[in-house]
C-alpha cells in the first residue's frame, strides 16, 4: 500500500486526487506544520527538503508533487499518454503549473494573506502574474477540453491551485473557458474525495497562523 505524507494544501491535494482517480489503495499520514512534523529526522529521510507531499511505495520514496504524479501515471499506465508527443504535451502543462502557476500564486498567497507587512508592490506583482498565467490557461482551454486534450495529471496538478484563486486575491472573471474547466473537474467524484484528504481545518484563523509560522521555517 502507498503511504501518503500530506497536508491540506494545493500541492497535497494533487496527489490525493490522483490516488483517488487511479483507485490505488493508500494510507494517509497528515503532517502538522505547527508541530514541524515535516522537519523530523524520520520525514527528512523520505524528503530531504522537508516539504509535503511525499509518498512511499513498497519502500521507494518519491517527493515533489509533479514527480509523484508522473510516477503514479507511469506505474498505472493512466492519466498520461505513452506516445512521445502525447506525453510531452502533458509534461509541458505539468511544468507550466510547477514552474509558473504554483510559485506565482504561492507568493500571491503569502503577500496577500500571510506576510506581516503589507507590501503592495509585491502583492500587485504576484497577483498580476498569476492572472496572466490564468489567461494563458484560458486560451489553451478555448481549444481543448482539458490542458493536454484528455484529462491528465496536468489538470490534476493545476486544478487544486486555480480553485483557490480567491484566497490569493486573484479573479477568474472573464475567463469563461477556465471557469468551465474548474466546474467540470470539480464535479468529478474522485476529485471531491481527494480534496477531503486530509480534512482542512474549519477555522480560517488557524490556517493563517500556521502559514505565517512557516514563513520563518
Where are these regions (language model features)?
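GST superfamily/GST-like fold recognition
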Residues: 100, 105-109, 146-174, 179-187, ...
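Acidic/histidine-enriched, glycine/proline-rich intrinsically disordered or flexible terminal extensions
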Residues: 198-217
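GST-like domain detector, emphasizing the conserved glutathione-binding G-site
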Residues: 1-131, 138, 143, 211-212
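Short, solvent-exposed alpha-helical surface patches in well-structured domains
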Residues: 89-92, 180, 193
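Short, solvent-exposed turn/loop segments enriched in Gly/Ser/Thr/Pro and often Arg
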Residues: 32, 153, 198-201
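Short secondary-structure boundary/hinge segments and terminal tails
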Residues: 36-37, 73, 183, 202-204
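Residue-level signal for nonpolar/aromatic packing positions in well-ordered secondary structure
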Residues: 55, 68, 137, 155, ...
Amino acid at each position: 500500500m502507498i503511504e501518503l505524507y500530506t497536508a491540506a494544501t494545493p500541492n497535497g491535494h494533487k496527489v490525493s486526487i490522483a490516488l483517488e482517480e487511479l483507485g490505488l489503495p493508500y494510507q494517509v499520514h497528515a503532517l502538522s506544520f505547527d508541530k514541524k512534523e515535516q522537519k523530523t529526522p524520520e520525514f527528512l529521510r523520505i524528503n530531504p527538503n522537508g516539504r509535503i507531499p511525499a509518498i512511499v511505495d513498497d519502500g521507494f520514496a518519491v517527493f515533489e508533487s509533479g514527480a509523484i504524479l508522473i510516477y503514479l501515471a507511469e506505474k498505472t499506465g493512466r492519466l498520461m499518454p505513452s506516445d512521445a508527443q502525447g506525453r510531452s504535451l502533458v509534461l509541458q502543462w505539468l511544468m507550466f503549473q510547477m514552474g509558473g502557476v504554483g510559485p506565482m500564486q504561492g507568493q500571491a498567497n503569502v503577500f496577500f494573506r500571510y506576510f506581516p507587512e503589507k507590501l503592495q508592490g509585491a502583492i500587485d506583482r504576484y497577483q498580476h502574474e498569476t492572472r496572466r498565467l490564468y489567461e494563458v490557461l484560458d486560451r489553451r482551454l478555448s481549444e481543448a477540453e482539458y490542458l493536454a486534450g484528455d484529462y491528465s495529471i496536468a489538470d490534476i496538478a493545476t486544478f487544486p491551485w486555480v480553485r483557490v484563486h480567491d484566497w490569493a486575491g486573484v479573479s477568474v472573471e472573464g475567463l469563461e473557458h477556465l471557469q468551465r474547466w474548474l466546474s467540470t473537474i470539480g464535479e468529478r467524484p474522485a476529485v471531491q474525495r481527494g480534496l477531503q484528504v486530509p480534512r482542512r481545518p474549519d477555522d480560517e484563523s488557524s490556517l493563517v497562523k500556521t502559514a505565517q509560522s512557516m514563513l520563518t521555517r
